[in-house]
């Protein structure tokens, strides 16, 4: 009767180990945790089950405790397993970076950072107040925080449970004390600090259905209002987690999160410890299964809740790894448009005083390999280009071109889907005199990000947040070359130098759902400045057919790591900036083409274009036809 539920829980408990093996990008050196029992990784000895350290979550069939959310999150970020150990445990060695201790109040959390960390038995338990182990606090004795680490902070519940919060003023003061811990970390050098909002204590088995439910819900809200206000004044990247809203969504639609939809999820629990054990999914129920329940005991979540919170935190951290690829999509569209112009420039010039019209269509493939702060992605694109040119004299040809490009990018672990429609217009000029030649183009474009769907794991299912936005693109490009062979030769070989400038702006936007996971993003700008050298060659293989080839090496001067400023749409006043994609400084590009004169003045051409940097590959094919008149 227990086999299937226990199997499900065993698989859930393996999430930590599996996530470490499959860890995605992470710009953080490690994860450092401060807080209370909601994040305690095993500070206290396990006096019942004999495991190295007790955690305030449910046990599996073998008696092992489920991981807490920072352990799961750290695994997904690729943090070393030893770093996820508790800091001051009696039984788990060596010491890790998780300083959270069950029973800690907001003052004790602050003390564990600035003065002394103690594993002390909390009030209400046998031997309350007994210190099992202590060590200097994280920043004690003048130590500094790791600026490249991610800090994880939760707390406040024990101020209520231990009778320290009895009024709105008490709740405001407790919220300010938790914010003081974030302030202390920032003053010590921390840059990235993730902070829980306090769950609604009225919506826990300990207080649900009691006269204290509504007052505690109001006091929890007062705590959070104070906390958010204080966090907004700290000069660091404070990443809030709207845990109350997340849990309310789980309670409103439990089946979407794999929870039982026919059970009282806030009035019952799994273990029966200081709460009513669920008769169906409780540990002694007819079908024991902690993944179907939100609470393990009177106030602590099961593995289902811990996984949900870890996924929520990861979805926020991972968002810029995908969203900073939006400007790169636009740059890819610009490059495809410029490639089409260069392809067209290889066709024979029309006679002086004549026009030449052309139309071309192509397809592109775009691949981003993962970086330490950017997701991998696979893109597909299609374009249509039309234009014309007029030959002024023997040396000059001027023209205009317009293009439409549709691009789709799948990025990240859950295949988020981003679509871009871009519309480009260019004016260009070509020059050739004796053996010298040159070309230049000015391009402007409108960007229509019509369907942006960010998808991520959230519990047992995926969730998507959607939005749309616009943008603009500007570019200038030029080449100067010298033909080594005379114009009358059947072959041409021309070394050249090139210069390119491009600027893309993606307007900020908010995802539309209004849920806990919905994010808002500020404007993004990405500029590219490149210089290059290359060789352009051609050979006349038949009287009406010519083959072309080009290879170039370019250096990108704008290769700084990109970032994006963002906020939870449910907490719009608290924004933060996180890092994302990093352009590479060296780029190789090459092209092959053939032009064939069908009849006098009508040319058919085909081209293949390829670009490669360390983690970016773009390639495309196109077919075009031009007509002189």
UniProtKB/Swiss-Prot annotation:
Catalytic activity field: a carboxylic ester + H2O = an alcohol + a carboxylate + H(+); hexadecanoyl-CoA + H2O = hexadecanoate + CoA + H(+)
Cellular component aspect of the GO annotation: cell outer membrane
Molecular function as annotated in GO: carboxylesterase activity; lipase activity; long-chain fatty acyl-CoA hydrolase activity
Top-tier EC class: hydrolase
InterPro entries: Autotransporte_beta, Autotransporte_beta_dom_sf, Esterase_EstP/EstA, GDSL, GDSL_lipolytic_enzyme, Lipase_autotranspt_EstA, Lipase_GDSL_AS, OM_autotransptr_brl_dom
Record's bilayer topology term: Multi-pass membrane protein
Alphabetical GO biological process terms: lipid metabolic process
Residues on Periplasmic side: 393-394, 432-435, 485-490, 542-544, 599-601
Role description: Esterase that catalyzes the hydrolysis of p-nitrophenyl esters of acyl chain lengths C4-C10 and Tween detergents. Also has a pronounced thioesterase activity towards palmitoyl-coenzyme A.
Protein name: Esterase EstP
Organism in which the protein naturally occurs: Pseudomonas putida (strain ATCC 47054 / DSM 6125 / CFBP 8728 / NCIMB 11950 / KT2440)
């Amino acid at each position: 009767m227990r086999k299937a539920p226990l199997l499900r829980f065993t698989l859930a408990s393996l999430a930590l180990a599996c996530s470490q093996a499959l860890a995605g990008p992470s710009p953080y050196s490690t994860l450092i945790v401060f807080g209370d029992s909601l994040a305690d990784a095993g500070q206290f000895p396990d006096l019942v089950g004999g495991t190295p350290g007790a955690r305030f979550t449910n046990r599996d069939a073998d008696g092992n405790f489920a991981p807490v959310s920072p352990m799961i999150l750290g695994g997904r970020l690729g943090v070393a397993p030893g770093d996820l150990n508790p800091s001051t445990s009696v039984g788990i060695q060596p010491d890790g970076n998780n300083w959270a201790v069950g029973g800690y109040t907001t003052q004790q959390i602050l003390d564990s950072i600035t003065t002394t960390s103690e594993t002390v038995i909390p009030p209400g338990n046998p031997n309350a107040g007994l210190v099992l182990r202590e060590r200097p606090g994280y920043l004690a004795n003048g130590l500094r925080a790791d600026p490249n680490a991610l800090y994880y902070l939760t707390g406040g519940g024990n101020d209520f449970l231990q009778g320290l919060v009895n009024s709105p003023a008490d709740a405001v003061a407790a919220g300010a004390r938790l914010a003081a811990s974030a302030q202390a970390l920032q003053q010590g050098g921390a840059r990235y600090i993730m902070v829980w909002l306090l769950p609604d204590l009225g919506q826990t088995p300990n207080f649900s259905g009691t006269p204290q439910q509504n007052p505690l819900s109001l006091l929890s809200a007062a705590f959070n209002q104070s906390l958010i206000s204080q966090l907004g004044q700290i000069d660091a990247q404070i990443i809030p987690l709207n845990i109350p809203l997340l849990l309310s969504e789980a309670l409103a639609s439990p089946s979407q999160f794999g929870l039982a939809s026919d059970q009282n999820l806030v009035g019952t629990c799994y273990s029966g410890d200081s709460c009513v054990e669920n008769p169906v999914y409780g540990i002694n129920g007819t079908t024991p299964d902690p993944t179907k329940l939100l609470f393990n005991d009177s106030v602590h979540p099961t593995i289902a809740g811990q996984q949900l919170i870890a996924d929520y935190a990861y979805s926020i951290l991972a968002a810029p790894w995908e969203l900073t690829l939006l400007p790169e999509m636009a740059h890819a569209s610009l490059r495809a448009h410029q490639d089409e112009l260069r392809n067209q420039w290889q066709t024979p010039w029309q006679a002086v005083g004549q026009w030449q019209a052309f139309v071309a269509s192509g397809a592109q493939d775009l691949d981003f390999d993962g970086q330490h702060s950017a997701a991998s992605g696979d893109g597909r694109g299609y374009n249509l280009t039309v234009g014309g040119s007029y030959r002024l004299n023997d040396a000059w040809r001027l023209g205009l071109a317009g293009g439409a490009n549709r691009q789709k990018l799948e990025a990240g672990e859950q295949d988020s889907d981003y679509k871009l429609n871009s519309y480009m217009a260019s004016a260009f000029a070509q020059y050739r005199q004796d053996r010298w030649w040159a070309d230049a183009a000015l391009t402007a474009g409108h960007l229509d990000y019509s369907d942006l769907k960010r998808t991520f794991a959230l519990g047992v299912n995926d969730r998507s947040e959607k939005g749309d936005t616009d943008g603009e693109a500007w570019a200038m490009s030029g080449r100067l070359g010298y033909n080594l062979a005379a114009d009358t030769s059947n072959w041409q070989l021309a070394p050249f130098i090139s210069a390119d400038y491009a600027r893309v702006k993606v307007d900020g936007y908010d995802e539309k759902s209004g849920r806990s996971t919905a994010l808002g993003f500020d404007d993004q700008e990405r500029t590219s400045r490149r210089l290059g050298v290359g060789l352009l060659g051609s050979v006349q293989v038949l009287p009406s057919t010519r083959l072309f080839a080009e290879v170039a090496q370019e250096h990108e001067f704008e290769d700084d790591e990109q970032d994006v400023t963002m906020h939870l749409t449910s907490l719009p006043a608290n924004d933060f900036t996180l890092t994302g994609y990093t352009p590479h400084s060296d780029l190789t590009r090459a092209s092959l083409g053939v032009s064939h004169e069908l009849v006098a003045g009508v040319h058919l051409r085909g081209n293949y274009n390829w670009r490669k940097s360390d983690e970016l590959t773009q390639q495309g094919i196109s077919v075009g036809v031009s007509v002189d008149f």
